Each structure stands twice: as structure tokens, then as C-alpha cells.
């Protein structure tokens, strides 16, 4: 029986979670999903989850963090605001994606 290692790439607490993957060729960690329950939004809990991912990535020698937003997705404006507030800068964009990046 083979087991999934996906659990190795998630941080969570009672208010939310972040899933991520390492992009070795870019020395970056990519935040795949970041979610907090509505009652926990706006108080830094999403940043705390991202900080945990960044700390692990930095310990492993990664130097940046990447996040993406699909402009056509519901809530995309709020998602973009969250990434900007976390200190990410525009890296690139396409017809339905925005890539943000932050040095860690």
C-alpha cells in the first residue's frame, strides 16, 4: 500500500490552512492554497500560516515565495490584496493569472 506524502505539504490550525510545494529549479516555495475561516480573516492569521511555510522553506535553502491569483475567480480582488499586504510584488501576469513573489 502506498501512502500520499501530501500531508507533508500542509500547515494548518483551527482557523485555516496553507498547502504548498517546492519549486527546486526556482529555489522557491509556491503557496498552492491558503484559506482562513471567515471569522478569522483580517487579523493576521493567513500571514501566520504563510510565515510557517516560509520558515520551513528558508530552512531548506529556498529564497523566495510565490503566490498566484486567477482574476476570474470569485474573491480574486481580496486574494490580491492579501498577497500585496504580505509584501509580495508582481512577478508576471497572463490572461487569467497573476504571479506574485516575495523574497524570504
Where does each model-flagged region fall?
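Conserved beta-hairpin
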Residues: 2-18
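GNAT/GCN5-related N-acetyltransferase fold signature
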Residues: 20-22, 36
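Conserved active-site alpha-helix within GNAT-family acetyltransferase domains
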Residues: 71-92
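Conserved acetyl-CoA binding element of GNAT-fold acetyltransferases
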Residues: 27-38
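STAS-like cytosolic regulatory interaction modules
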Residues: 93-104
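Conserved GNAT acetyl-CoA-binding A-motif
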Residues: 57-72
